[in-house]
Design a protein with these regions (language model features):
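Short cysteine clusters
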Residues: 43, 62-65
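Short Gly/Pro-enriched loop/turn and capping motifs at secondary-structure junctions
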Residues: 68
């Protein structure tokens, strides 16, 4: 697996979302209960940007049709999506965001 480094990453605040691009793929990054989480930024229902949605507990809610995904597993927790989203391993090291899938 390849580790992708994003230098100078100033991460989201607790309970917030941001997005980064890795090899042309948008990745939503969130800090939830002190844990950095990263998932594909595209909802599997209608391709809306999850980083523009909301965090509820340990899930992200799509802003378009309110589909809900678990940030740790990518599983669909509710709403119209039928397929899970991709999950990335995320870590902050030496001022850089490291993502791996």
């Amino acid at each position: 697996m390849t580790i992708h480094r994003i230098e100078g990453f100033d991460g989201p605040a607790e309970g917030d979302l941001t997005s980064v691009t890795v090899d042309g793929t948008k990745v939503a990054v969130a800090l939830v209960e002190g844990v950095l989480r990263a998932v594909d930024d595209t909802c599997t229902h209608m391709a809306c940007s999850l980083s523009e949605g909301d965090i509820e507990g340990t899930s992200v809610v799509c802003p378009c049709h309110f589909g809900r995904f678990d940030l740790a597993t990518g599983a669909v927790l509710g709403g119209p999506p039928e397929r899970p989203i991709g999950v990335w391993r995320a870590a902050l090291r030496d001022g850089a965001l490291e993502l791996e899938r």
